[in-house]
Amino acid sequence: MNYPKLPSFRLDGKRALVTGAGRGIGMGASIALAESGANVTLVSRTEKELKDLTDHINSQGFKASYQVLDVNNEDEVSSFINNAEPFDILINNAGTNRPAKLIDTKIEDFDYVMSLNVRSV
């Protein structure tokens, strides 16, 4: 079966920011944006993952940089925003979960999950 192909999707000259970029959906989105021509800034709490992904993207001839950042930390986020150049694209992908039944979840864990998944966006 033949499917129609979409025209080439280009983001040349655009600046993109991806939170939670170190793995999973964030990693995939970062690679796709870079392959489409965007200059991608990767954000996560884990420097090794960010460095490895940045090196991978740049080694393919695309543009990426990274910033270690906890999007749940207001001071870190404010500092980052105040020092960053404007972005054209924002992918708020940072998120987490605590694998437990809600009835068994500690309030501290619940608050952390809600803060990261809702407020950080």
Which residue ranges define each predicted feature?
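The beta1-alpha1 cofactor-binding region of Rossmann-like NAD(H)/NADP(H)-dependent oxidoreductases
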Residues: K48, Q67-S79, I107
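Conserved glycine-rich cofactor-binding loop
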Residues: R15, G22-G24
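Flexible N-terminal pre-Rossmann segment of NAD(P)-dependent oxidoreductases
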Residues: M1-K14
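Conserved glycine-rich Rossmann-like NAD(P)H-binding loop of the short-chain dehydrogenase/reductase
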Residues: A38-D52
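Conserved catalytic-site loops of classical short-chain dehydrogenases/reductases
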Residues: D88-I89, D111
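Conserved NAD(P)H cofactor-binding loop of Rossmann-fold oxidoreductase domains
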Residues: A94-R98
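Substrate-binding pocket helix/loop in short-chain dehydrogenase/reductase
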Residues: K101-L102, D109-Y112
